[in-house]
């Protein structure tokens, strides 16, 4: 499974929301993510992809869409 599919599956499982048709929509504005959900998502992404997401790199505007989350995970895995 590729990173995109895995991230979409994690978001769907955590928040019971299929975001595959809203890849560039702000997930906070859409009600998918909130502050607690963000923490849950970070923990799940770190565990699943065996990465560490530095707090300095997880700003709301930096990871607020599915595409930005996928891009961030890809960059961290390639670092």
Swiss-Prot record:
Record Pfam families: PP-binding
Pathway note: Cell wall biogenesis; lipoteichoic acid biosynthesis
Top-rank taxon: Bacteria
Record bears the keyword Mitochondrion: no
GO cellular component labels: cytoplasm
GO molecular function per UniProt: D-alanyl carrier activity
Domain Carrier: from-to ranges: 1-77
Keyword Flavoprotein applies: no
Cellular localization per UniProt: Cytoplasm
PTM notes: 4'-phosphopantetheine is transferred from CoA to a specific serine of apo-DCP.
Principal place of residence: cytoplasm
Post-translational modification O-(pantetheine 4'-phosphoryl)serine, affected residues: 35
UniProt entry keywords in alphabetical sequence: Cell wall biogenesis/degradation, Cytoplasm, Phosphopantetheine, Phosphoprotein
InterPro entries: ACP-like_sf, DltC, PP-bd_ACP
Gene Ontology BP term (one): cell wall organization
NCBIfam families: dltC, PRK05087.1
Family, per entry: Belongs to the DltC family.
Function, in words: Carrier protein involved in the D-alanylation of lipoteichoic acid (LTA). The loading of thioester-linked D-alanine onto DltC is catalyzed by D-alanine--D-alanyl carrier protein ligase DltA. The DltC-carried D-alanyl group is further transferred to cell membrane phosphatidylglycerol (PG) by forming an ester bond, probably catalyzed by DltD. D-alanylation of LTA plays an important role in modulating the properties of the cell wall in Gram-positive bacteria, influencing the net charge of the cell wall.
Protein name: D-alanyl carrier protein
